Amino acid sequence: MKKILSLCMVILTSFSLCACSSEERKETNNQTKTEEKIYGVGETTTYKKDGQERVHFTVNSVSNTSDRNEFADSQPEQVIIIHYSYENIASEEDVYFSSVNFKVIDEGGNVCETYPASINTYPQMAPAGTKSEGEEAYGLKQQSSKIKLVVDLDYFGNKVTYELPIQ
C-alpha cells in the first residue's frame, strides 16, 4: 500500500512539474521582441532625451575611392568614404560625430577600421541650433556592395543601424 501511495505521489508531482514548465514556455513565447529599425541613405534618425528632440543624424552617401595611402599599414580590399551630416536641435552640449561614434561592418561580417585616405569634409563641433557634416574613410577587409553602419548617438547605448549601398 505504501508503495502504491508513493508511486501516486511521484506521478502527481511529475504532472504538476510538467504543467508548470509548459506555462513558463508559453509566457516566454508570448513575449515580443521590439525590432530595431534599419535606416538607409538619406534617412534621418532623431536622438531624443527627456522626450525632447536633441540631434538629427543622416548618412548622405557611401562611395568607393581609389585613393590609397602608401604609408598605411593595412592593405584593404576596398576603401570607402562615408559622407554624413548632423544637426544640434536642442542639445545643451556641442554635438560632434566622427569615427569614434561609428562601427562599420562589411558584407563578410568584418568590423572594419578607419583608413588614412583623403577626405574633403571634416566634422565640426555644432552648438545648439547649428549643423555640420563630415566624411570618414574606412578600409573594408572584403569587397562589398553594401555596409552596415552602427552609430552610437550618445555613448550610453543609444545606437542606430544603417544598411548602406556603396556607390
Residue map of PLM features:
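Repetitive helical segments and hydrophobic/amphipathic motifs
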Residues: 11-12
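Conserved functional micro-motifs across diverse proteins
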Residues: 20-167
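Positively charged n-region of N-terminal signal peptides that target proteins for export
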Residues: 1-4
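C-terminal motif of bacterial Sec signal peptides marking the signal peptidase cleavage site
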Residues: 15-19
